[in-house]
Amino acid sequence: MRNLCFQTFYTSKEESNCPLITEIVRIGKRIEKQGLSKDVRSAIFSLRYGHRIIINSDYNDLGGIKRGEILEIVDYDPVKKILLTIGPTQPRVETPVHWMIHHARNEINAIIQLNGNKIIKKLEGKIPSTEKEQIPGSFELTKEVLKTLRTGKSVLIKNQGVLFVGESFKEVEEQVFKNII
């Protein structure tokens, strides 16, 4: 999906050295191994790393996410819509939403977002949903998601996918597999 939501500036085009990158690679492999990738059009994994977050860029092969496909987001200004990043690839359009969720709620350190119609159909009526459809990556979508997350740790994003949050990747992983498998 083409990014119309923000402008990106790179502090470095080199791969991030964040020690948490292996967690994103591991969860991608586990989701692939469990057969979930057939129901998913795209997957976004993000982890808090101090004031920064790490997030995967393009979705290609869930089981084969590489270190170079993971970006370290240094900062994001939602007013100016400027993203400051480290890494060799382009950020996903959903990156600002993940950034703002991580920074709006201190207890959220991990997010897994799975997009696709099959995953939506599996979870419709089982978890809370956003009220309105919003543009992916937009501030309006972030507000809808945060409003829905007030009462839980998962949200069905209308016509997009499902988002799970938690204090750790392990907690979020358990939610994903409990709700989907």
Regions found by a protein language model. Give the residues of each.
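Glycine-rich flexible loops
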Residues: M1-I181
